[in-house]
């Protein structure tokens, strides 16, 4: 008994098995009506349940064609619906498929009558908002309340003005921009567009059609940087372009002369000697190397002083007169000059005494 009530989907098979005596009974009762599809679930068992989902399409047509069949099936409608809902009906009288709108007792008929009407009133999905009608009513009320209806008629349809500045948002969604002004000028006079130029004017140009625009070369433009290494790299890479553009070589030559490796900081002492010695000597003993350099420098300085003394001595010997005597003469002269008064006084005194 329970095996007969198992849910079966799709079209029923034509070959009736022993458990499918319900279809034969339905065919015997109403041979003209052929029912297919799933049986009704909530029909008859729950009074206010009704049919869920899409409402029946051909319900009214079937009601008009077979009013007598409805009366015959009303008697067995409740029991069959309840048994189908409980899955314990051995021979349901209604059969499978979508039930009729008028099938079942008064409650079933009421549900069937309500479903098409409710489907029309209530549509599936989200209900629509009634904003247009409300806005129209509000506009009518505003016009009735405000005496200045002519002012509102002058306003364009769309978003109201911001209050201070009319940005023309209602039509375009954007404010008055630059293109509109250009359009007015072009409509009035075609000439103002040519001389009116925006942006930075071209520099070192004889005119708009005089010389060509910027020709991209690898050489940097403007004042060269302090670091000359990247500039030299650019110059090395652009030797081919310099050969092609002979006129630009004159401009590049002053850049080469101007840009020189700029040395900053304190120059290194005896850099050449240190570099030569570093190539020959290991760098494990820097202190001794520095001392040796200092000693060498001191010895060189002493040698220079000695050579100067020797040259001075040779000059004195060549003159024939001893330099020491010259120095003494010069010093003696100075001393005599300083002591002239004292010596002369003594001499005069002696002469005066002798006389």
Swiss-Prot record:
Residues 119-130 have a biased composition (Basic residues). It comes from the Eukaryota. Residues 307-318 have a biased composition (Basic and acidic residues). InterPro entries: AT_hook_DNA-bd_motif. GO terms for molecular function: minor groove of adenine-thymine-rich DNA binding; satellite DNA binding. Residues 7-14, 34-41, 60-67, 94-101, 122-129, 155-162, 174-181, 196-203, 219-226, 262-269, 281-288 bind DNA. Residues 1-355 are annotated as: Disordered. The modification Phosphothreonine is found at residues 115, 321. One of its GO terms (cellular component) is nucleus. Signal peptide: none annotated. Residues 64-77, 135-147, 237-247 have a biased composition (Acidic residues). Residues 345-355 have a biased composition (Polar residues). Keywords: Acetylation, Chromosome, DNA-binding, Nucleus, Phosphoprotein, Repeat. This satellite DNA-associated protein is a double-stranded DNA binding protein specific for tracts of pure at DNA. It may play a role in organizing the higher-order structure of euchromatin as well as heterochromatin. D1 may be the most abundant member of a small family of D1-like proteins. This is Chromosomal protein D1.
């Amino acid at each position: 008994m329970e095996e007969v009530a198992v849910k079966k989907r799709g079209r029923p098979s034509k070959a009736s098995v022993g458990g499918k005596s319900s279809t034969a009974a339905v065919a015997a009762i109403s041979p003209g009506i052929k029912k297919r599809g799933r049986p009704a679930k909530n029909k008859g068992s729950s009074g206010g349940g009704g049919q869920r989902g899409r409402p029946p399409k051909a319900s009214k047509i079937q009601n008009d064609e077979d009013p007598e069949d409805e009366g015959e099936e009303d008697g067995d409608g409740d029991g069959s619906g309840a048994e189908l809902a409980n899955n314990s009906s051995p021979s349901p009288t209604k059969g499978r498929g979508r039930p009729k709108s008028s099938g079942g007792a008064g409650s079933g008929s009421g549900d069937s009558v309500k479903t098409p009407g409710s489907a029309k009133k209530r549509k599936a999905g989200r209900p629509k908002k009634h904003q247009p009608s409300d806005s129209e009513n509000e506009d009518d009320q505003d016009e009735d309340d405000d005496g200045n209806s002519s002012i509102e008629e002058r306003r364009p349809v769309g978003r109201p003005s911001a209050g201070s500045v009319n940005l023309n948002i209602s039509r375009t969604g954007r404010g008055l921009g630059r293109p509109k002004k250009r359009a007015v000028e072009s409509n009035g006079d075609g000439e103002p567009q040519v001389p009116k130029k925006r942006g930075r004017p071209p520099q070192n140009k004889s005119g708009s059609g005089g010389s060509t625009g910027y020709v991209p070369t690898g050489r940097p433009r403007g004042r060269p940087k302090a670091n000359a290494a990247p500039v030299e790299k650019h110059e090395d890479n652009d030797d081919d372009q310099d050969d092609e553009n002979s006129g630009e070589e004159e401009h590049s030559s002053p850049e080469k002369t101007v840009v020189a490796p700029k040395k900053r900081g304190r120059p290194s002492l005896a850099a050449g000697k240190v570099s030569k010695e570093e190539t020959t000597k290991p760098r494990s003993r820097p202190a001794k190397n520095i001392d040796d350099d200092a000693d060498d420098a001191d010895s060189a300085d002493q040698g220079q002083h000695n050579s100067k003394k020797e040259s001075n001595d040779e000059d004195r010997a060549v003159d024939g007169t001893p330099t020491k005597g010259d120095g003494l003469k010069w010093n003696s002269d100075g001393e005599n000059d300083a002591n002239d008064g004292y010596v002369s006084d003594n001499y005069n005194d002696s002469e005066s005494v002798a006389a």
